[in-house]
Amino acid sequence: MRGCLRLALLCALPWLLLAASPGHPAKSPRQPPAPRRDPFDAARGADFDHVYSGVVNLSTENIYSFNYTSQPDQVTAVRVYVNSSSENLNYPVLVVVRQQKEVLSWQVPLLFQGLYQRSYNYQEVSRTLCPSEATNETGPLQQLIFVDVASMAPLGAQYKLLVTKLKHFQLRTNVAFHFTASPSQPQYFLYKFPKDVDSVIIKVVSEMAYPCSVVSVQNIMCPVYDLDHNVEFNGVYQSMTKKAAITLQKKDFPGEQFFVVFVIKPEDYACGGSFFIQEKENQTWNLQRKKNLEVTIVPSIKESVYVKSSLFSVFIFLSFYLGCLLVGFVHYLRFQRKSIDGSFGSNDGSGNMVASHPIAASTPEGSNYGTIDESSSSPGRQMSSSDGGPPGQSDTDSSVEESDFDTMPDIESDKNIIRTKMFLYLSDLSRKDRRIVSKKYKIYFWNIITIAVFYALPVIQLVITYQTVVNVTGNQDICYYNFLCAHPLGVLSAFNNILSNLGHVLLGFLFLLIVLRRDILHRRALEAKDIFAVEYGIPKHFGLFYAMGIALMMEGVLSACYHVCPNYSNFQFDTSFMYMIAGLCMLKLYQTRHPDINASAYSAYASFAVVIMVTVLGVVFGKNDVWFWVIFSAIHVLASLALSTQIYYMGRFKIDLGIFRRAAMVFYTDCIQQCSRPLYMDRMVLLVVGNLVNWSFALFGLIYRPRDFASYMLGIFICNLLLYLAFYIIMKLRSSEKVLPVPLFCIVATAVMWAAALYFFFQNLSSWEGTPAESREKNRECILLDFFDDHDIWHFLSATALFFSFLVLLTLDDDLDVVRRDQIPVF
């Protein structure tokens, strides 16, 4: 028995040794197994509007669970606030929020990148969670939110957590809402279109320009891009200082609702602020970049306003057509009455009718327009019979030796003798063949058509590209609209700015019709060999008038193209034709009394091209570069002197290397050797005043260096044109010439229209000289028909003013149509 017991103990010894070994501790039969931890235990019991504090580290994380019930047709938005005193960017506090359809995460401190590798840290972060809306089909929904707070810090990082429900998350129509945002605490709100509203305007204002902010409109989808580095990823957006406005249409949002997102940028350079920010060590940015904002969503105009405004634009300018028809009908009745009374029909004995022909009310283009009959003070000149001159003037039987010496006709045909006479008359400067001169001036018309086609086609292509980029990217900082009065239509963002340019096209075409009528009447007079069309009045050349009409129409087309997307890159689209219009008007004024010595079309358009090129250089380099202004001012002064010399000497003063020697001789003989009055006093007065004006412009530009170089150049052209026109009218009255009622009315209308137009032009509703946000500070509401703004009225009035200006040039010398050309003075 004892042996059996020993044998049993010997068999159990290996098992006892194994159980007692250190690598395999013996299990206590009384110790229960360790319970598994429920990962949601720490999240249970979390409440809204309660601040939770804690410490997280490498081995500890806290999970909070929040639940609420969303009712149908009610949107409940939740906002999470997290604050951490830790500034250690290597071990930030990590926040992960899990919802039914979205996971949102961020770190505290929140890091933002700026220019030149600068970084900004924010220890207080709050984000709005993407809301889930219950529907009538689903009924009330139980929403569950988990907030996971963790950190990889070995020693722990403290934090504070607050989760709240937003009471004012949905914006209402015509109700202003005030709130505060910062770079680490962006805000966004929901807006739903009412059933009776198809378009709205989001208006955002702030009393403080900085910090720079971004307003974005995004479709209803999660996640919402509400941080500086991703706000541009979705929707429509624009930068903002004090004002922002975005026009939206219901048809662009399938759910008929959208989010309005407000983001504060960490730096202000995008809004025109400083590129450099003084940063101190251990400086917190939480309180330095807060901005108070006010948002209001108002209904935009209805479709009926589009129709009413379009009809207004058409009818207001069609009334000019009716007015011209009425004036033409009155002239026709007066002509018929005079014909019945027998006021026509007296004969001068040469077979030509001497009558107050209706051509006196038009602008004829004379055949051999420089010639007069044999009683002229310039004998010896002949007119070809084909040009309407009196027949029977054949060559004499003089011997061939007469060509060996100068006769009186040879002397009178010498330009240097004729154009340097003290008293010049129109017959002295209208000696060239009518057909040659007519073809010369028609080149202006054909050249400007060619320029317009080649200029407009790439312009249209470019602005279409700009508009496409705006529509695709949603970046409304590309174009400088007046966003408070920018009414979209189709793919166009500001249809009202385009529609208002219709006046240039319609009035330009009307001016072409008026010129064409005068041209036809004149040709009929030439065919009838009317002596008044041949030897009386100002020689008429319609080429420049046709060119002016085309230029006015193209100004409207290119201005409309510019306003498709006005910005720094396409300002010269319409200003180019403004320069050409001003230049053509000055050429026409000069050509009126100097028909034989006007500039050729090629040199004139080449000069305009140089001006446009200089303008582009001025816009690019003229802002801060003093050297550009020094060079430009010197060229401006020298060009004024050279042009003045050519005008004073009627083109007989050669500009070459010997100009300085000749100028010194003239100065010595006329000013030092004997001080004599100028030979051409009237011209001298005009040129002295003109040079003073141009030198003043040059000095002003050199001292102040205006940023808007394009407007500065346009001001030079307009001032010179007005100065020349005023001189022309004064000299006309001084020469005992009359101003008929029609041109007098046009002069008064021109002055009134230009004064009103310039008032609206200087309202400055936007400007591409600054940033888009700075430009929006100047935006204003519509003032006409709730559709047109101040700049649109400028378009209306400037088109009308240009039309009347052209009529002034067309009709100013109608009183001379019954005056012989050898009695019309040149000035």
UniProtKB/Swiss-Prot annotation:
One of its GO terms (cellular component) is lysosome. It is found in: Membrane. GO terms for biological process: RNA transport. Residues 331-442, 516-541, 591-600, 648-683, 732-741, 813-827 are cytoplasmic. Residues 20-309, 464-494, 563-572, 622-626, 705-710, 763-791 are extracellular. Residues 375-397 have a biased composition (Low complexity). Glycans are attached at N57, N67, N83, N136, N282, N471, N567, N764. It is a multi-pass membrane protein. Its main location: membrane. Residues 1-19 form the signal peptide. The chain crosses the membrane at residues 310-330, 443-463, 495-515, 542-562, 573-590, 601-621, 627-647, 684-704, 711-731, 742-762, 792-812. Residues 398-408 have a biased composition (Acidic residues). The keyword Ribosomal protein does not apply. Pfam families: SID-1_RNA_chan (PF13965). InterPro entries: SID1_TM_fam. Residues 355-408 are annotated as: Disordered. Coiled coil: none annotated. GO terms for molecular function: cholesterol binding; double-stranded RNA binding; RNA transmembrane transporter activity. The keyword RNA-binding applies. Keywords: Glycoprotein, Membrane, RNA-binding, Signal, Transmembrane, Transmembrane helix. Residues 364-374 have a biased composition (Polar residues). In vitro binds long double-stranded RNA (dsRNA) (500 and 700 base pairs), but not dsRNA shorter than 300 bp. Not involved in RNA autophagy, a process in which RNA is directly imported into lysosomes in an ATP-dependent manner, and degraded. PANTHER family: SID1 TRANSMEMBRANE FAMILY MEMBER 1, SID1 TRANSMEMBRANE FAMILY MEMEBER. Belongs to the SID1 family. This is SID1 transmembrane family member 1. The gene is SIDT1.
